[in-house]
Amino acid sequence: MGMNKAELIDVLTQKLGSDRRQATAAVENVVDTIVRAVHKGDSVTITGFGVFEQRRRAARVARNPRTGETVKVKPTSVPAFRPGAQFKAVVSGAQRLPAEGPAVKRGVGASAAKKVAKKAPAKKATKAAKKAATKAPARKAATKAPAKKAATKAPAKKAVKATKSPAKKVTKAVKKTAVKASVRKAATKAPAKKAAAKRPATKAPAKKATARRGRK
């Protein structure tokens, strides 16, 4: 449900304890003062309630909702209202609405809204700090453990294996070269024996020649 101007005047009449004429004049004078100030480009600030001001809109292109045609809109000035901190706090429920007296007091709602805004981030910051503190040692331990194992055990074993394997290879290579050398020596000696065996064969024809001479 909404409240119109007549209903507002009735409520104001009861609160002021005056007649309807005075309440009507009060409402009209307040509205007239705000409209004239905003028209000039000034802003009307009511602490805790809000600010009435003028906003400038640049030229833009709009669309007609009925026809769908594009329409150029000239730059204009538009009245605007910015609600105050106490007004926002009361509507959102952050600040309790008093049963009696003014709903918005100067310097009361604003301080309460600031306290709520300061307390909420502080709690979040402390929780985040605690989580970071618990996670940090775990990460440090995880980084230190692999470093010790890698530094003590792994490189030593690999180094020993690396030193032993070349020694075995060298001894095997020496044995292979020794076997090859002996084979080569045997190969060089074999032709000498064959040559010695061939030499007596040349002498055999000489004996046959002497035998033939005796027969003659």
UniProtKB/Swiss-Prot annotation:
Posttranslational mods: Probably acetylated by Eis in vivo. In vitro acetylated by Eis (strain H37Rv and H37Ra) on many more residues than those identified in vivo. Deacetylated in vitro by NAD-dependent protein deacylase (Rv1151c). Trimethylated on Lys-140 by human SUV39H1; trimethylation inhibits mycobacterial growth. SUV39H1 probably also trimethylates another residue.
Listed Low complexity bias regions: 104-114
Pfam family, one: Bac_DNA_binding
Catalyzed reactions per annotation: 4 Fe(2+) + O2 + 4 H(+) = 4 Fe(3+) + 2 H2O
Record carries keyword rRNA processing: no
Protein's cellular compartments: Cytoplasm, Nucleoid; Secreted, Cell wall
UniProt GO MF annotations: damaged DNA binding; DNA binding; DNA-binding transcription activator activity; double-stranded DNA binding; ferric iron binding; ferroxidase activity; structural constituent of chromatin; supercoiled DNA binding
InterPro entries, sorted: Hist_DNA-bd, Histone-like_DNA-bd_CS, IHF-like_DNA-bd_dom_sf
Gene3D superfamilies attached to this UniProt entry: IHF-like DNA-binding proteins (4.10.520.10)
Modification sites for N-acetylmethionine: M3
Key words of the record: Acetylation, Activator, Cell wall, Cell wall biogenesis/degradation, Cytoplasm, DNA condensation, DNA-binding, Ion transport, Iron, Iron transport, Methylation, Oxidoreductase, Repeat, Secreted, Transcription, Transcription regulation, Transport, Virulence
Residues bearing PTM N6-acetyllysine: K5, K74, K88, K105, K118, K135, K148, K169
Record CDD domains: HU (cd13831)
Entry's EC annotation: 1.16.3.1
Region (Disordered) residue spans: 102-216
Record family assignment: Belongs to the bacterial histone-like protein family. Long actinobacterial subfamily.
Name of the protein this chain belongs to: DNA-binding protein HupB
Name of the gene: hupB
